[in-house]
Amino acid sequence: MAHQSWSVLDAPNPTYLWTQLLVEELVRNGVHTFFVAPGSRSTPLTVAIARHPEAESVLHVDERGAAFAALGVGRAARGPAAWVTTSGTAVANGLPAAVEASVDGVPMLLLTADRPPELRDTGANQTIDQVKIFGDYVRWQADVPPPSDEVDPAYVLTTADQALHQTLRAPAGPVHVNCMFRKPLEPVETEASVAVPTAVDAWARGTEPYTHYPTPAPSPPGPEVDALAETVRGTEHGLVVAGRLDSAAAADATRRLATHLGWPLIPDLTSRLRRGGREQPEQVPYGDLVLTSAAFREGHPPRAVLQVGGRFASKRLRLFLRDSAPEVWAVVRPDPSRIDPDHRVTHHVEAAVPAAVDALVARLEEGPRGTTWRDDWAGASERVGAVVQAHVQESDALTDPLVAALLTEEMPSEHALVAASSMPVRDLNRHAAPGGTGGPAFANRGASGIDGTVATAAGIAEGRDGPVTLLIGDLALQHDLNGLALLQDRPVVAIVVNNDGGGIFHFLPIRKHDEFDPYFTTPHGHDFEHAAALFDLPYHRPDSPSALRSAYAQACRSGESALIEVRTDRATNRQVHDRLEASVERAVEEG
């Protein structure tokens, strides 16, 4: 996008001086992507962004989707993007993404326009109470008054600096800056002026932020590591469970911890360890499916569990750990919030994962190699993998487990993976090919909603400046059809598994009740060919595993976005999962 020549202090009126200061300070702090939804009251923000030479503006008509796209950038880049919207219900559309960002610790800047004080609570058009509208789901919020010659413009700079500090410091999360504007909203000359103090003038001639904050970092590991090391010293029957890990360094450290202890490592899809780790003797990529065997569960209760990183998707694993009642269950993560839905955690180490692992390894002797305990877990996982691979190779029909395994086998190394909530994240966590290539995997598992998934994938592509493979269900895609507009300029290959409704409910007890159909199956009878055409996306509808391989490879080679629709049957899908898990259980127990 072409920009006009930029001088931050060259503003036609006080409103534009403030918005230009705000945008410049955000850019200096590393915010370069602004997701802008159209609106009138936000005109001063939008124009300031459009004119800034280093601000990339992404336009999207759906405020909810734009907010999820900003969330996606934060997930991929671990730094915030800004969401910009006008006043009124437009602001409320940011709540779902703010909730997800808050619960899962994703940095994000909510930049909203508002009416001035004299129009609040007066019945003025498009005016609602936006102060603290996001409640406790934001780490910090500011209600910025209209520009005035009685307020030092340095206030704008220090507010921006504080917002960026609050969104990045542990625990990371969204912040809300609510900006009141009076008319005129357009960049027109007015008689009003704001004096520029010497300090702001000096700042304008430089390139550094006005207020420097230290790089936010979690506390270094302290005495709690000594206590934890003492409790697990000499333990052979332990497990390392890898939840969501946000960096390669954290993933490498977690792998090193398992190797040092000689403990099996059960990785979540979002741990950066679920795929590409087949040669690691401690790796148990099919841990969820191994636990289908009651005999294996009963014979392999861990005495100690080291859970590293954020949440993991497997309910089966969580219940196994709960029922095993380990003497030690420690969570190691750079966040003070608890992950303990079953109230079994005995230790919480709040520290950066690499630092915590270094501290633990330094305090613990190297564990034995080739123990029966480790080999039992790894061997069971290998046998499960053989069953899954046989299903992929022998099936002539497209099934949900096959799609998950096939995509992760074929995924190019430059692609990241995005898994929608509901069945896609579960199928990928269970059936993904462990030896496949590809980049990190992402999923909105903070609040686990299905909304905004397409927009999140687009934001991840934007944030990592690289292609994305998205696996999504039909209801989640219907929920975010507008998000397909964001795929026109960002390479996202979206594979939608269309089983005509809510397939996950076939796995829940409600299926035995009369109200199951249609209240939970929610059949809709639609396909997505016309949706792809509406947004000018190439469309494929493969009818066999070989056709899916071909369509996916073609879409990836193109370097552009595409929509691939895979039709499956909900009832058959449940039967396929049951048969596959029965085969898995036999394979585990026959070992």
Curated annotation (Swiss-Prot):
| Entry function | Catalyzes the thiamine diphosphate-dependent decarboxylation of 2-oxoglutarate and the subsequent addition of the resulting succinic semialdehyde-thiamine pyrophosphate anion to isochorismate to yield 2-succinyl-5-enolpyruvyl-6-hydroxy-3-cyclohexene-1-carboxylate (SEPHCHC).
Binding partners and assembly: Homodimer.
Lineage in the entry?
Bacteria, Pseudomonadati, Rhodothermota, Rhodothermia, Rhodothermales
One molecular function GO term is:
thiamine pyrophosphate binding
Q: Which reaction does it catalyse?
A: isochorismate + 2-oxoglutarate + H(+) = 5-enolpyruvoyl-6-hydroxy-2-succinyl-cyclohex-3-ene-1-carboxylate + CO2
Q: Which GO terms describe its biological process?
A: menaquinone biosynthetic process
The record's comment on cofactor binding reads: Binds 1 thiamine pyrophosphate per subunit.
The record, for InterPro entries, names: DHS-like_NAD/FAD-binding_dom, MenaQ_synth_MenD, MenD_middle, THDP-binding, Thiamin_PyroP_enz_TPP-bd_dom, TPP_enzyme_TPP-bd
**HAMAP family, alphabetically?**
MenD
Q: Which organism is it from?
A: Salinibacter ruber (strain DSM 13855 / M31)
Q: What EC number(s) has UniProt assigned to this enzyme?
A: 2.2.1.9
Q: Which PANTHER family does the annotation name?
A: 2-SUCCINYL-5-ENOLPYRUVYL-6-HYDROXY-3-CYCLOHEXENE-1-CARBOXYLATE SYNTHASE (PTHR42916), PROTEIN PHYLLO, CHLOROPLASTIC (PTHR42916:SF1)
Q: Which cofactor does it need?
A: Mg(2+); Mn(2+); thiamine diphosphate
Query: What keywords appear on the UniProt entry?
Result: Magnesium, Manganese, Menaquinone biosynthesis, Metal-binding, Thiamine pyrophosphate, Transferase
User: Which pathway is it part of?
Assistant: Quinol/quinone metabolism; 1,4-dihydroxy-2-naphthoate biosynthesis; 1,4-dihydroxy-2-naphthoate from chorismate: step 2/7; Quinol/quinone metabolism; menaquinone biosynthesis
Family per UniProt?
Answer: Belongs to the TPP enzyme family. MenD subfamily.
What is the name of this protein?
A: 2-succinyl-5-enolpyruvyl-6-hydroxy-3-cyclohexene-1-carboxylate synthase
